[in-house]
Amino acid sequence: MEQVSATARYLRIGPQKVRMLVDGIKGKSVEKGLNTLRFMPNKGAGLVEKALRSAVANAEEKNMDVDGLVILNVLVDQGPTLKRFRPRARGRATRILKRTSHITVVLAEKAAKN
């Protein structure tokens, strides 16, 4: 079973927000996964869809059957955190953490039933 993957790195969205979405597409065919993501209203859905389309393009480069691909796994890891400050009362400042994510999509060919 041949596998192909694609990674989208340094995306400006928190990994916790993206992880909620990816559980809905794991194990589905690529076509069903894309349809599911297309109708989600979240910002992260568009980012995962872009990574999924990139993985499909990588599969085409490897001459794999695109119609028989299944989403084997989707990993969402935390990237570097951007630290910013917001002015507060009495001359103080509080830290704002702007989190980033790395999304890895792994596709595999569907196992043929004998």
From Swiss-Prot:
Alphabetical list of InterPro entries matching this protein: Ribosomal_uL22, Ribosomal_uL22_bac/chlpt-type, Ribosomal_uL22_bac/org-type, Ribosomal_uL22_CS, Ribosomal_uL22_sf
A biological process from GO: translation
Molecular function as annotated in GO: rRNA binding; structural constituent of ribosome
GO cellular component terms listed in the entry, alphabetical order: cytosolic large ribosomal subunit
Keywords on record: Ribonucleoprotein, Ribosomal protein, RNA-binding, rRNA-binding
Pfam families: Ribosomal_L22 (PF00237)
Role according to the record: This protein binds specifically to 23S rRNA; its binding is stimulated by other ribosomal proteins, e.g. L4, L17, and L20. It is important during the early stages of 50S assembly. It makes multiple contacts with different domains of the 23S rRNA in the assembled 50S subunit and ribosome.
UniProt family annotation: Belongs to the universal ribosomal protein uL22 family.
Description of how the protein assembles with itself and partners: Part of the 50S ribosomal subunit.
UniProt xrefs under HAMAP family: Ribosomal_uL22_B
Name used for this protein in its record: Large ribosomal subunit protein uL22
Native species: Desulfosudis oleivorans (strain DSM 6200 / JCM 39069 / Hxd3)
Gene: rplV
